[in-house]
């Protein structure tokens, strides 16, 4: 044994050929701080081996290395920048020593080689992969860029243009695509990966493969003329500005880093990468995106626990077809859970089946599934005008019209048709679950299951716990949502649950801003371009449906009259009374036409101003800051109240629900990450300026107390000193 560490070992696999195996105790290998230190120690041990002729790197897991340990990131970002820079130098010294070892080196890649794992294999001379391999540098998706030589070695290996595409998109490449780009040197079967790798190393040792010129190429400047470089980098920067925009600086920083180091050797280029990596770690964007990743892991861990605690759903039913019912049925069937789709009208069943067929056809056209698979999915959706076979279903999702009396009647009826262990779930957006449960004999088997439209695109499902809902029911519905490929978040019952409860104060802020003379087009522009929402409030209302919003607004006002009851007619009333329902009838705040792809195209409607004029008697200019504050304060206050009341369990789950359910700007990380970033005292000062506007602008006492105590919503990152490498 040459070296034995906790996460890797090194021994001779054949005379002269050392084999470094990543073998962490957990289910996957991560290039965490401890593993990186072990790599350094192992390489030191290898340098002392007099008989060493070649080095093979591999993993004993189904994945090579899934990346760095992201749980360590926020602690590392908190290190003083000079210390972080020094540590990066030490870490890169390890990979440089791997690259410089005076024998040929080869990485045998199975499964994921991502982030630091990819940077590790880039430091070797050759890379052989099996067909399961997936290789990439996803750091820009976390608001940073490669920091262990990825932005230096990859362009020198495959060229600047393809390297910039890999780095700026952050999307990993499958084995065949990585081979086409030159990221790897061959694809072999999993069974022969190690033996084929040893054979390839022997060829390099014997001089049949020129490993030294490969190494020289990776350490030299890029082979670009000044004209080629100017064209390449200018085109890349233009595309990045269009795709990533100003709110996500990492892709542009990565491109500029590659550009500025293009004519440098490896060591000088690594200095440029170091400087840019450290700068990105200090941005709120990086902390927010890393925070989203960690929050997502928390939500998934809760779902995994629910899956362990429950039996899998093998058969389901949906009551109410149409677009929503068809979308739910498609999602269930496409993930392997057959579904009965029941409705009282054949026309609705046809609409639901057409919706499922349309979604499958799109996947077929894009090559994402075969015709056989499409037929199998469609055949696992059974449309029906009666309850035949529903007694065998594990779960029934009710998705009829958003009317409490109709929903209660349908639920009571179907409860008599199902077996006593079956779960009933209501896909309602605002109606309290405990209210609907009053019509049921077994309320413990009932909960809410709020899907977002369009079902196939929106990742979030709110699982709503009623007063009498059992934990067993919650666990099984969470497990079913996970089976469907969704991200379930459990919330406690109240009107609107979590997402819609916090959305309607946002709409109230919009109505008040228009009442006070704001311009809806300017508001949309500010909330989209400056704050970062995918849609401004006027456009969002058009997409949701102004008739839908008008109805939900009344439900929310009844549930929270002290804050959400209106003091008179507002812009939503005015649009509703004018039959301006939004995209669904072609006219809302904007007018809509159908483009060549069959999608609604937004156009300015000059008549909108006249409708808005009926609920305001003034026009007044507002700054971007005033608009953002007046729009966001009502939502933020309601989010805080939901946490205080236990509607949502944690800041992490609240932020994920906002990002996945409403499209809250990921670069801000969610409401609680945003509050921590700007500071609670800063927020209180901002809110105080607008408290005269009404109850939705009154901040909860809990945030005042947190600010007074100097606290944040998220715990401070675990303090790390720069690790020795």
From Swiss-Prot:
Pfam families: 3HCDH, 3HCDH_N, ECH_1
Annotated stretches, region: 3-hydroxyacyl-CoA dehydrogenase: 311-725
Binding site for substrate: 296, 500, 660
Entry EC no(s): 4.2.1.17, 5.1.2.3, 5.3.3.8, 1.1.1.35
Example GO BP: fatty acid beta-oxidation
Annotated positions for site Important for catalytic activity: 119, 139
Active site: 450
Keywords: Fatty acid metabolism, Isomerase, Lipid degradation, Lipid metabolism, Lyase, Multifunctional enzyme, NAD, Oxidoreductase
GO cellular component, one term: fatty acid beta-oxidation multienzyme complex
CDD domains: crotonase-like
Residues holding NAD(+): 324, 343, 400-402, 407, 429, 453
Catalysed reaction, written as an equation: a (3S)-3-hydroxyacyl-CoA + NAD(+) = a 3-oxoacyl-CoA + NADH + H(+); a (3S)-3-hydroxyacyl-CoA = a (2E)-enoyl-CoA + H2O; a 4-saturated-(3S)-3-hydroxyacyl-CoA = a (3E)-enoyl-CoA + H2O; (3S)-3-hydroxybutanoyl-CoA = (3R)-3-hydroxybutanoyl-CoA
Region annotated Enoyl-CoA hydratase/isomerase, chain positions: 1-189
Its job: Involved in the aerobic and anaerobic degradation of long-chain fatty acids via beta-oxidation cycle. Catalyzes the formation of 3-oxoacyl-CoA from enoyl-CoA via L-3-hydroxyacyl-CoA. It can also use D-3-hydroxyacyl-CoA and cis-3-enoyl-CoA as substrate.
Family: In the N-terminal section; belongs to the enoyl-CoA hydratase/isomerase family. In the C-terminal section; belongs to the 3-hydroxyacyl-CoA dehydrogenase family.
Quaternary structure note: Heterotetramer of two alpha chains (FadB) and two beta chains (FadA).
Name of this chain's protein: Fatty acid oxidation complex subunit alpha
Native organism: Aliivibrio fischeri (strain MJ11)
């Amino acid at each position: 044994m040459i070296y034995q560490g906790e996460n890797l070992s090194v021994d001779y696999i054949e005379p002269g050929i050392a084999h470094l195996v990543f073998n962490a105790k957990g289910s996957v290998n991560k290039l965490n701080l401890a593993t990186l230190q072990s790599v350094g120690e192992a390489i030191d041990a290898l340098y002392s081996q007099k008989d060493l002729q070649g080095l093979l790197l591999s993993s004993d897991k189904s994945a090579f290395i899934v990346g760095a340990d992201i749980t360590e990131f926020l602690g590392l970002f908190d290190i003083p920048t000079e210390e972080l820079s020094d540590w990066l130098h030490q870490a890169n010294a390890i990979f440089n020593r791997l690259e410089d070892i005076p024998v040929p080196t080869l990485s045998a890649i199975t499964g994921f080689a991502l982030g630091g794992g990819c940077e590790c294999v880039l430091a070797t001379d050759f890379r052989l992969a099996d067909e399961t391999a997936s290789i990439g540098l996803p750091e820009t998706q976390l608001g940073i860029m490669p920091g262990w030589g990825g932005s230096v070695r990859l362009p020198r290996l495959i060229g600047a243009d393809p390297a910039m595409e890999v780095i700026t998109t952050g999307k990993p490449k499958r084995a065949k695509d990585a081979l086409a780009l030159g990221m790897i040197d061959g694809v072999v079967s999993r069974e022969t990966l190690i033996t084929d790798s040893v054979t390839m190393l022997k060829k390099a040792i014997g001089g049949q493969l020129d490993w030294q010129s490969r190494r020289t190429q990776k350490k030299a400047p890029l082979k670009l003329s000044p004209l080629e470089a100017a064209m390449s980098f200018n085109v890349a920067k233009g595309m990045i500005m269009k795709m990533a925009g100003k709110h996500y600086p990492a892709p542009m920083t990565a491109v500029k880093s590659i550009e500025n180091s293009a004519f440098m050797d490896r060591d000088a280029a690594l200095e440029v990468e170091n400087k840019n990596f450290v700068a990105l770690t200090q941005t709120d964007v990086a902390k927010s995106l890393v925070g989203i990743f960690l929050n997502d892991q928390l939500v998934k861990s809760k779902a995994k626990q629910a899956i362990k605690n429950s039996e899998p759903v093998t058969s389901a039913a949906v009551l109410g077809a149409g677009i929503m019912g068809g979308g739910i049925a498609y999602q269930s069937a496409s993930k392997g859970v057959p579904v009965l789709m029941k409705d009282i009208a054949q026309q609705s069943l046809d609409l639901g089946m057409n919706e499922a067929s349309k979604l499958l056809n799109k996947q077929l056209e894009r090559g994402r599934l075969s015709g056989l698979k499409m037929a199998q999915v469609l055949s696992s959706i059974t449309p029906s005008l009666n309850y035949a076979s529903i007694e065998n279903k594990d779960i029934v999702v009710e998705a009829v019209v958003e009317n409490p009396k109709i929903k209660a009647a349908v639920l009571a009826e179907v409860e008599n048709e199902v077996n006593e262990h079956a779960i009933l779930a209501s896909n309602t957006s605002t109606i309290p679950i405990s209210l609907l449960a009053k019509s049921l004999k077994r309320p413990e088997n009932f909960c809410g299951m709020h899907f977002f439209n369009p079902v196939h695109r929106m990742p979030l499902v709110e699982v709503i716990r009623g007063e009498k809902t059992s934990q067993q029911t919650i666990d099984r519905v969470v497990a079913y949502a996970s089976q469907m490929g969704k991200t379930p978040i459990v919330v406690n019952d109240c009107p609107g649950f979590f997402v819609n409860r916090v959305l309607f104060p946002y709409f109230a802020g919009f109505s008040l801003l228009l009442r006070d003379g704001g311009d809806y087009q300017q508001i949309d522009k500010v909330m989209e371009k400056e704050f970062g929402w995918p849609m401004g409030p006027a456009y969002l209302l058009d997409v949701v449906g102004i008739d839908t919003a008008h109805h939900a607004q009344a439900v929310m006002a009844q549930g929270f009259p002290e804050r959400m009851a209106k003091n008179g007619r507002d812009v939503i009333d005015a649009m509703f009374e004018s039959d301006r329902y939004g995209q669904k009838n072609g006219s809302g705040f904007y007018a809509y036409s159908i483009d060549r792809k069959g999608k609604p195209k937004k156009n300015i409607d000059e008549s909108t101003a006249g409708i808005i004029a009926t609920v305001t008697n003034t026009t007044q200019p507002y700054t971007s800051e005033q608009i953002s504050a007046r729009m966001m304060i009502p939502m933020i206050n309601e989010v805080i109240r939901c946490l205080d009341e236990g509607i949502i369990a944690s800041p992490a789950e609240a932020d994920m629900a906002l990002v996945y359910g409403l499209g809250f700007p990921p670069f801000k990380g969610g409401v609680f990450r945003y509050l921590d970033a700007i500071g609670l005292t800063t927020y209180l000062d901002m809110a105080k300026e607008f408290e005269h506007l009404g109850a939705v602008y009154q901040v909860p006492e809990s945030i005042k107390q947190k600010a007074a105590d100097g606290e944040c919503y998220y715990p401070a990152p675990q303090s790390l000193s720069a690790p020795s490498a």
